[in-house]
Amino acid sequence: MRSDKTPDHYIGGFAVHPQYAAEEMQLVSQAYHQDRGVRLRHWIISFEKHELADAWHANQFAQMACRFYADTYQIVYSVHEDAEHLHVHFVMNMISYQNGKRYSGQKKDFYDYLKYLQEIADLFGTYIIRVKDDLSSQNTSPFGANGRLRPLGKR
């Protein structure tokens, strides 16, 4: 993790130590003989300047957002403060540390996650929209390689 992007060190994980995330996720994949194909999911949640007071609040949002998958999948996040707006990168091991099954990535799960995120956003007085950038619009997966979920506006 780059300290220039995370000066306040808001980095965390569930079922994995963030400093050793790559190695620990690889070990889970190997233990279940699932070390081929796509094994990681990456997405970003970004915030407008007026939506959250500071990086601490983005960290609180990120911790809550991770809990949706934390009982089944290793997940790590990092709050980036180096841009005009705060944003959080998430990386999830698609191989379950509980049973070795691969994350299915079905649309129902995506929409359940969006609903869950909206419940969190409600606590912060904002709401979630899905934003497609040029790269993710070419990908049919709800969590494209560059998929972005963005809270937008105060309620």
Listing of model-derived features with the role each one plays in the protein:
Residues 1-155:
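N-terminal nicking endonuclease/strand-transfer module with a His-rich metal-binding environment
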